[in-house]
Curated annotation (Swiss-Prot):
Its main location: membrane. Residues 55-72, 140-156 are extracellular. It is found in: Cell membrane. InterPro entries: CASP_dom. This is CASP-like protein UU1. Glycans are attached at N141. It is a multi-pass membrane protein. Belongs to the Casparian strip membrane proteins (CASP) family. Residues 1-33, 94-118, 178-183 are cytoplasmic. The chain crosses the membrane at residues 34-54, 73-93, 119-139, 157-177.
Length: 183
């Protein structure tokens, strides 16, 4: 009798088609931290970029329009990154991926907003970098060193935020294609 019980426990039921395989789950789980890390990087880099540029704008009395543009884009990018970070954390906490449990409209909106934020950040950073180069803020003799170092730091962090936003755009584009093919 004990042998028959051992034999019956050897043969388990076949895997259910409704339970995801371990390979599929492993493919999903690496994407959860990736999008959260990218959103954290977006928020931190854009926060540093716009706060340094806002301080710089205050020092030059707001006379340079491209600095105002960079601050405005930095604020918008930071707010958007914070909103997306909170949603991504909510998805991770509830156990869903960013591509499941949300509507296709959300996928489209996220992809479009990520793309727009990416383009606006690169344009703002480029405008400020060009202004610094053309206006001679950073002279070859080292004049304006404090202003030069702060503006260079702000542009550097804006470019780092751009890289984080562009990587996030690739990942949200992947989620969007996956959502479209699923439908």
């Amino acid at each position: 009798m004990e042998e028959s019980q051992q034999q019956s426990t050897k043969f388990d039921a076949p895997p259910s088609p409704y339970v995801p395989s371990r390979v599929y789950l492993a493919q999903i789980y690496w994407k959860k931290p990736a999008i959260v890390v990218l959103r954290v990087l977006q928020f931190v880099f854009s926060l540093i970029a716009f706060s340094v540029m806002a301080d710089l704008l205050h020092d030059v009395q707001g006379s340079i329009k491209s600095l105002s543009y960079t601050v405005a884009i930095g604020v918008l990018a930071c707010a958007y990154a914070l909103a997306q970070l909170s949603f991504s954390l909510w998805c991770v906490i509830r156990g869903a991926t960013s591509s499941s449990g949300v509507t296709p409209l959300y996928q489209y909106a996220t992809f479009i907003c990520d793309q727009m934020s990416t383009y606006f950040l690169i344009s703002a950073a480029s405008a400020t970098a060009t202004l610094i180069d053309v206006s001679g803020v950073c002279g070859s003799n080292g004049s304006g060193t404090n202003l030069c170092s702060r503006s260079t730091a702000s542009v550097t962090f804006a470019f780092l935020a751009f890289l984080a936003f562009s990587a996030s755009s690739v990942l949200t584009g992947y989620y969007l294609v996956k959502c479209i093919l699923k439908a």
